[in-house]
């Protein structure tokens, strides 16, 4: 179970392994935890995917919302909590980690806040028995030693992470101001990108896109 329009990589793996993908709509600009859980419970789903903060919206849920969602995960189901952008959430809003909770596995990366996308360093936080199951199917293309050393060094330099957070916040504010000056609005973001609401329909959004391209600004089409 996932949200209709959410980050698509989860979908590819479900399809690749012959699974059935079920989707539920967003609630405004946010993924809808209750709707995801209701659908999972109704369909007896094995996996539920939620990104917090969300890609592509950039919005996020407060810690209490996510912690409540984890507590309500149906029996026999696992919540895949994508926290790729967790380093950018407002102070105090990241949900606490209970490493012994077998209802959730948290996916994180050094590609965003730590700026190490080329090193391909990702990791999961989960209960020991759950993580142990992955050892049975883990392939031999593991993370290289240089990437591991870089990740450990990055963890030791929290001053740099704070600098990156500050720079990203400035960038979001700049993009928001540019949008405002052109009669557009931005969605609140806890990521290193900003979603711009063009405020009308798809035709107008396409016109904005075309004008950006005409002015030498490349915009990657979503998914």
Feature annotation, model-predicted:
Residues 26, 169, 179-215:
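Conserved PLP-binding catalytic core of the aspartate aminotransferase-like
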Residues 103-180, 184-187:
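PLP-dependent aminotransferase class I/II
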Residues 89, 127, 156, 199-200:
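Residue-level recognition of strand-loop junctions within catalytic nucleotide-signaling folds
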Residues 1-50:
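PLP-dependent aminotransferase-like
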Residues 22-24, 47-53, 79-83, 188-190, ...:
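Short beta-strands and strand-loop turn motifs
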Residues 15, 31-43, 56-79, 83-116:
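Active-site pre-lysine segment of PLP-dependent enzymes
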């Amino acid at each position: 179970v996932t949200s209709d329009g959410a980050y698509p990589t989860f979908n590819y793996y479900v399809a690749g392994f012959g699974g059935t993908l079920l989707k539920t709509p967003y609630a405004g600009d946010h993924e809808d935890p209750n709707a995801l859980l209701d659908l999972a419970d109704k369909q007896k789903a094995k996996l539920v995917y939620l990104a917090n903060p969300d890609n592509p919206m950039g919005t996020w849920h407060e810690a209490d919302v996510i912690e409540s969602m984890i507590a309500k995960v149906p029996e026999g189901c696992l919540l895949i909590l994508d926290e790729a952008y967790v380093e950018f959430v407002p102070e105090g809003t990241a949900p606490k980690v209970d490493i012994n909770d077998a209802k959730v596995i948290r996916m994180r990366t050094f590609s965003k806040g730590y700026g190490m996308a080329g090193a391909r360093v990702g990791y999961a936080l989960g209960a020991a028995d759950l993580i142990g199951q992955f050892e049975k199917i883990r392939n031999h293309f593991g993370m290289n030693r240089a990437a591991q050393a870089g990740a450990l060094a990055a963890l030791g330099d929290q001053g740099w992470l704070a600098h990156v957070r500050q720079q990203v916040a400035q960038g979001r504010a700049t993009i928001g101001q540019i949008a405002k000056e052109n009669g557009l609005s931005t969605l609140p973001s806890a990521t290193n990108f900003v979603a711009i609401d063009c405020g009308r329909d798809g035709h107008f959004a396409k016109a904005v896109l075309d004008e950006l391209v005409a002015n030498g600004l490349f915009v990657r089409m979503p998914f």
